[in-house]
Amino acid sequence: MTDRADADRPATSPTGLRLYDTMTGAVRDFVPLRDGHVSIYLCGATVQGLPHIGHVRSGVAFDVLRRWLTAKGLDVAFIRNVTDIDDKILNKAADAGRPWWEWAATYERAFSAAYDALGVLPPSAEPRATGHITQMVELIERLIDRGHAYTGDGDVYFNVATLPDYGKLSGHRIDDVHQGEGVATGKRDQRDFTLWKGAKPGEPSWPTPWGRGRPGWHTECVAMCEAYLGAEFDIHAGGMDLVFPHHENEIAQAEAAGDGFARFWLHNGWVTMGGEKMSKSLGNVLSIPAVLQRVRAAELRYYLGSAHYRSMLEFSETALQDAVKAYAGVEDFLHRVRTRVGTVVPGDWTPKFAAALDDDLSVPIALAEVHAARAVGNRALDSGDHETAMTQARSIRAMMGILGCDPLDERWESRDETSAALAAIDVLVRWALDSRADARNRKDWATADQIRDRLKEAGIEVTDTADGPQWSLLDGDSKDV
């Protein structure tokens, strides 16, 4: 999927890979900073609630990038952070009457379970924001010393006016910038953004030279990027909704601190429903457990990865079932070859498959090559040409392995994904229902009802019975608690 005419020329980089860089608006040759090594930072989850399929699309998309780079013989350092301190986390935990750290840890586990269910490789490191307060404070001190940040009413702000090219990633003109942070009395200019939030009653806080408080979101990622990958690294990735203000503000801090930061900026498109971004605030989310009640994890992974990573993925039941059928066709062919001919070990991917992935991870074209090989293999198998059938099957295994959904991989064959997903969600639902029971014992009916309602929003129905509460996925099987 290319956006510029010159992007059609063959790759000339040592890796053979060309990627669309949001900063330049063009597909560029990817040349790592260090020969043979690639450093990637992916903005991970803000662990405020159960993951939905929109949340995990970035994990699937950039898992393919990581697998492809690794297959090319490159050593990949892949960092995916966890935002475990945030306004939404604090507010939701307070509403539920739970400690904020317990709330964050619970949903961090839920995200980890979702990534694992979808076959996303674990990151090289998965730093939590709260584990890097020291690095954040040091970064803010550098910005203050360089004249790019100032204190006000216990907070610390970044002075946007000190960077004339602010907005270069998103295309925002500096005079038109609006941070969406609301009115803050300590700000000199409403275009400025928060680096550090002064302590408030009942909120967690850490000591700093300018008083107790907690970090701003944008500061967290800069500190963690540089702690693990250094002042300059290869790729910074995330959802397209992060381009502004989050990634724009990361760039501002890093450059103001004198660091090179990311050389490529990659952004994946949203999962949409009815043309709208899948979002809890819009009420149009599909939780991972709810979807895995209808399809297998490998099928959901195939679906999420079937569109080009930069395009919008409009969710529909028809499209999901089309993906299920397409995956089944590949799976059935491999099983037929294994039954009739023998063990199928991964072989070589085709040149067209490699060319597709080298062209900004054009997975739809790569999948077309998979299905072309399947068609050739099926004809060969039906005609008794077992050698050709096996060659095609081995190639398919190699290609589907890069895409993370090889049907003969032991992770997909060795377990019942639906049962595993239900077991994982059962742990989380039990925790929520224990909280609800505590609230009912305190006669805090409002909190008890709120927990039940939030579970329902996530696709989980709770029914009170004489034997205790039962939960079920909406339109699914029930489970005693």
Curated annotation (Swiss-Prot):
One of its GO terms (cellular component) is cytosol. Its EC number is 6.1.1.16. Signal peptide: none annotated. ATP binds at K280. InterPro entries: Cys-tRNA-ligase, Cys-tRNA-synt_Ia_DALR, Cys-tRNA/MSH_ligase, CysS_C, Rossmann-like_a/b/a_fold, tRNA-synt_1_cat_dom, tRNAsynth_Ia_anticodon-bd. Zn(2+) binds at C43, C221, H246, E250. The keyword Coiled coil does not apply. GO terms for biological process: cysteinyl-tRNA aminoacylation. Gene3D superfamilies: Cysteine-tRNA ligase, C-terminal anti-codon recognition domain (1.20.120.1910), HUPs (3.40.50.620). Belongs to the class-I aminoacyl-tRNA synthetase family. This is Cysteine--tRNA ligase. It comes from Mycobacterium sp. (strain KMS).
